[in-house]
């Protein structure tokens, strides 16, 4: 921020606005913008801004205030008073001053905390000012007069004002911040030229609101002094132009009635009116409303903005919509609950016969349950019932099932008894493996060529063998029908899985998984390398012994 300070000229005057959120210290560039600073300082001296509000808040842009009406369309400059119409610091001292733009090349809206004048529609300035909240060069440079900046920690009070809650879809705060008082610190070049004005400070407010027209009071009857002896005193009675009482309540004999021919009411009608008072007619109420209706305001007077907290004349349309949505949702929930209930009657249809007293006591929504006979009885209601009361199945079918189960059980027991003395018919897994291995070894050389696979050239290849091949089953002898009754199921050792023990017993198996430990391989490689180096060294030693002798011999032979 110091880079921006170096481009700005030094301020020469200062003022302070005391708000409900704290003070705002403003330094003024009086040498660069003399007319604008003079206008602002004079308003501060006159306490013109006391009671005004910050009526406009635009987030990340500006905070605007200085309007005594609080609407954004009020406020006047000091140059509208005769005392300040001519200023020697203006461009033409002989012409009336109209406060317009005072632009300077070193004053730019390039940061927050800069104070400028709010321009009206006709391009002139009044008393309204604004404080920037961010960089606004594109929007404000060359458009509005920059005449000051916020000093010190008071910029945080400006940020608090900018965080105020706003009315929906407007730039007006709900609870606006008010300026309590004004204080002038340094006048700078205006020292000795500006002073506080007591009577003129309130003049613009009186000019803005024109005085209401007062009704002229009725003048009393003009009479001459009477000394009791003049002629005509007795003939002309003195009466006021307007009675001092309500003629509808009090009747004066001296005043003629409003209607020349009053209507005569019959005694019967008078009795009816006494017994039952008549309610006021709508015409009379309408006339009363028209009589008490306020006059239309003057279009030239400034009206304040509508208070956002005041109740609206017409009720909003949103609550009925919410109620309709809520009622629709509740109706959908009730329909869903009703669909989940059992609404179909399970009882017998009405045959038209007369119900007994006991049946009449049963509610219509009751569900009739299934009749169950007591346990132990074959039929519940009578001989014709076909279901059992306990299981719900037919008793005859149940007896037949039990009979068949007992017969099968007896058959198994008899088969075990018959096979017991002769020995067990089951064969252990080890015997079967031995038998199959011997049979294979006996038949392998004979059937090796016949059983070779055409694709893999492997004997008894399981990949090429069809799963539904029943050749072995046809060749096997037929077993007795009763052998399966006494057969015991036993599983042999899985040779295809090749567990760890089998691998240890068959280390040379090609299909077995080979595990290579890199550390062992490293040891073997290092050991072999060392052994190879030792062999090379030994070979070199032998060659050196022989070579030395031959070399020496050849060297000697050379001239």
From Swiss-Prot:
Q: Which GO terms describe its molecular function?
A: peptidyl-prolyl cis-trans isomerase activity
Q: Which family does it belong to?
A: Belongs to the cyclophilin-type PPIase family. CWC27 subfamily.
Query: Which Gene3D superfamilies does the record associate with it?
Result: Cyclophilin-like
| Gene name of the encoded protein | cwc27
Its predominant location is cytoplasm
Please describe the quaternary structure of this protein.
Associated with the spliceosome.
Q: Which reaction does it catalyse?
A: [protein]-peptidylproline (omega=180) = [protein]-peptidylproline (omega=0)
Keywords (A to Z) from UniProt:
Cytoplasm, Isomerase, mRNA processing, mRNA splicing, Nucleus, Rotamase, Spliceosome
Q: Where is the PPIase cyclophilin-type domain?
A: 11-184
Composition-biased stretches (Polar residues):
384-394, 425-442
| Origin species | Aspergillus fumigatus (strain ATCC MYA-4609 / CBS 101355 / FGSC A1100 / Af293)
Instruction: List localization entries.
Output: Cytoplasm; Nucleus
Q: Name one Pfam family in it.
A: Pro_isomerase
Q: Give the GO biological process terms.
A: mRNA processing; protein folding; RNA splicing
Region feature (Disordered): 201-395, 413-449, 518-559
What GO cellular component is one of the record's annotations?
cytoplasm
By what name is this protein known? Answer: Peptidyl-prolyl isomerase cwc27
Q: Which domain of life is it from?
A: Eukaryota
Q: Where is the composition biased (Basic and acidic residues)?
A: 261-273
| UniProt biased composition (Pro residues) | 305-319
EC code(s) of this entry: 5.2.1.8
What is the purpose of this protein? PPIases accelerate the folding of proteins. It catalyzes the cis-trans isomerization of proline imidic peptide bonds in oligopeptides. Involved in pre-mRNA splicing.
